[in-house]
Structures are given as C-alpha cells and as structure tokens.
C-alpha cells in the first residue's frame, strides 16, 4: 500500500488535488459546520448550500477579477455537455435580433481531439457548422497552432460563434493568445477545461468560457461557465419555435441557470464545496500570478529535460507546447511500456498517453509541485542514461 505522500498523480483528469484541501474536505464530508451532517447530505437550497454557491462565485470573481457583466454558472454534464449548450444558447441569443438566425454558421478552430469533438457534436445536432481550420489537415498532425492566415472564417454577419479549445488535453497544444480577426457579430466561445485556474483570462475577448472542474479545480461533477450578460438575452421558447430555432433543454439554458443562482435543479454542492476550498487555498497562496509562475517553471523544467535527450520525442511544436499536458514519445516506442512500469515503481502514476494517441503524457496541474515534477525529471534522466547508445 502506498501513502499519499509517496505517490505523484500525473493524471489528465480526474486529477490530483491539493492534499490540505482534500483533508479539509474529508472532515466536512463527515460533519459540515457542526451540523452533524456531511456536506454531501445538506440540501442545495438550504442556507448552507446556497452559501457555498455564493462563496464560490465570490472567490472566482476575486481570483479572475471577473467583470460584473459576466455571470458565473455552476452546471453539470462536463465540458461535453457544453458542446451542445453553447450552441443552443448562442442561436437563441442571435434570434433576438436576427429572424434568420438559424442560417448563421458556427465556426470551429480544430487543434486537437476536444475541439474536434465539439465540432462533431454541432454536426450531430444539425446546427450549421464550418471548420475554420483543422490543424491535422493543415499540418499532417495535431501539434501546432494556426496562424491568422490559416483561419478561414465565414463572413461578418453570417457567423453565429467562433469556438476554440484553449488547451488540448490529449495532444498537449495550448494557445498563447486568443484567436484574432473574429467575424463581426460572432459570439466567442472558449473551452478552458484543462488550463483552468492557471493564468489570467482576457474577458474582453470572450463571451462564453467554460471548464470542467475535474482537471485543475477539483472533483468531477461541476462545469464552471462564465457567460457575458448580453448573451443571456433571448426570445421566449414559443417565439423560438416560430423561428424554427432549437430550444435548449432546461438544464442547459444559461438564462434559467443564471436566474436561479445555479440552483434550478439539484446542484452537487459537496463537489462545489471542494472546488471552493481549493479556490480559498489558491487565493491565500498568491492567486493566478503564483499559479502561472509555477506552471511555467514546471513545464520548462520538463521540456528542457526532454529536449536534451534523443530518446524522448516531443510531439508538439515549441510555440504550441502546453504548460499543463506535456506529451511525448520514447524512441524506440517499445521502451514506453518499460518506462511506464519503471515510473510505477517510483510511485509516478497515470503517465500513459490518451488511448487514441498513445505515448506518454504528464499533466502538471496546480496540485503537482515543482518538487514532484523533479521526481519525474530524475526518472527521465536515469532512464535515458540506462538506454543511451
């Protein structure tokens, strides 16, 4: 049996959590605020339950300096549910001013597996959609970012939304800046699930931002959505039916969730409490400035180690490398299973790459310290030495 102190969990999600946060949550799971009930047993509509929601909203605003013209929603269904939710809400919003909203086209910037899945969902649901760029088609594989000239958007006034994934968890690709030259009138949608709470967000360049909590914020079960207030405006469902615009399911409707303080249906307040404990910890330990500095330090140490050994092949162009999900191969690839087995012996776990791409992936989320990253680096060094020609 291994102790928590021995094991370094490099999982891509659900991922490692800060130990002191887990310990505090464990106490509250048994007895929350002296109620004689655990936090998972209290009503989401109770004073304590709604207090968790209010506190988490406040802490997110402090951490990100979120403008007052953005709502914070706590939803369910993961990032995958947001693939559909953003479409329903955006088309309903456009219908308020454009009777021909159903002809507007959703544009997707595809840089890896998750943005591709988002596009596939739009196709499956029958929304008009267009690929502004697919980096696999452009470059032969996922591992780079598009230049402005690569982005082939539909024209101004004909575009419903522009969607991109800020950090591709599977392929280890991360944007350095939001895409530019977005068509006029388009709603800007961004999936930040796997680099959430790791750097500042420019809210002037986004309208909908969402993140599944299970990577950098806490346990699975809640999706955090930041949505510009203006996007919440939409016709009634009856009016949308007349315009032949799809009506969002109730639990995916941003306006309903905003009007009900994220408590329209049963919110997993225990999960949100765990997230909020993490927010409090991060605010007390330097906030986003400290978190970004740590992520840069950890990823630089790891990439520098990979780059100096021919045994390791980084599969992402340097300018597109993720700070969160470091992906690489070992040549010859037969050595990868040996490396993973050796890592397990050293209590370095969950390093196997995503099932569709293979290889090695080390996820350096906030709960992974510089010291823990150095433990992986030490193994990489010794493994390279043992297999040098």
UniProtKB/Swiss-Prot annotation:
Pyridoxal 5'-phosphate binds at residues 79-80, 114, 169, 191, 214, 265-266. Keywords: Amino-acid biosynthesis, Aminotransferase, Pyridoxal phosphate, Serine biosynthesis, Transferase. The keyword Transferase applies. The modification N6-(pyridoxal phosphate)lysine is found at residue 215. Pfam families: Aminotran_5 (PF00266). InterPro entries: Aminotrans_V_dom, Aminotrans_V_PyrdxlP_BS, Pser_aminoTfrase, PyrdxlP-dep_Trfase, PyrdxlP-dep_Trfase_major, PyrdxlP-dep_Trfase_small. This is Putative phosphoserine aminotransferase. The lineage of its organism: Eukaryota, Fungi, Dikarya, Ascomycota, Taphrinomycotina.
């Amino acid at each position: 049996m291994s102790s928590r102190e021995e094991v370094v969990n490099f999982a891509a999600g659900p991922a490692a959590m800060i130990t002191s946060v887990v310990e505090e949550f464990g106490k509250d799971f048994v007895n929350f605020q002296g109620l004689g009930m655990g936090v998972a047993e209290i009503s989401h509509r109770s004073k304590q339950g709604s207090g968790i929601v209010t506190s988490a909203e406040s802490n997110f605003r402090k951490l990100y300096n979120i403008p007052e013209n953005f709502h914070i929603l706590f939803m369910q269904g993961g990032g995958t549910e947001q693939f559909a939710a953003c479409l329903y809400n955006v088309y309903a919003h456009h219908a308020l001013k454009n009777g021909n909203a159903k002809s507007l086209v959703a544009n997707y910037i595809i840089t890896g597996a998750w943005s591709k899945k988002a596009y596939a969902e739009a196709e499956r649901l029958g929304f008009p959609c267009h690929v502004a760029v697919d980096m696999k088609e452009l470059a032969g594989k996922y591992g780079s970012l598009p230049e402005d000239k690569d982005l082939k958007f539909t024209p101004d006034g004909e575009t419903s939304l522009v969607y991109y994934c800020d950090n591709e968890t599977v392929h280890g690709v991360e944007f350095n800046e939001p895409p530019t030259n977005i068509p006029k009138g388009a709603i800007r949608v961004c999936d930040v699930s796997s680099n959430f709470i790791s750097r500042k967000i420019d809210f002037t360049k986004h309208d909908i931002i969402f993140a599944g909590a299970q990577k950098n914020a806490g346990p699975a079960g809640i999706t955090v959505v930041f949505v510009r207030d203006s996007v919440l405006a939409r016709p009634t469902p009856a009016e949308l039916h007349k315009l032949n615009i799809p009506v969002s399911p109730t639990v995916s409707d941003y306006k309903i969730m905003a009007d009900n303080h994220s408590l329209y249906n049963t919110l997993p307040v225990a999960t949100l409490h765990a997230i909020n404990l993490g927010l409090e910890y991060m605010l007390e330990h330097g906030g986003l400035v400290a978190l970004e500095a740590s992520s840069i330090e950890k990823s630089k140490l790891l990439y520098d180690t990979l780059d100096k050994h021919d045994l390791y092949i980084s599969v992402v162009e340097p300018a597109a490398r993720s700070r969160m999900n470091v992906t690489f191969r070992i040549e010859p690839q037969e050595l990868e299973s040996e490396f993973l087995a050796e890592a397990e012996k050293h209590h370095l776990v969950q390093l196997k790459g995503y099932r569709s791409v293979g290889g090695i992936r080390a996820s350096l989320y906030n709960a992974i310290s510089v010291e823990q990253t150095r433990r992986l680096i030490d193994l990489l060094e010794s493994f390279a030495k043992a297999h040098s020609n």
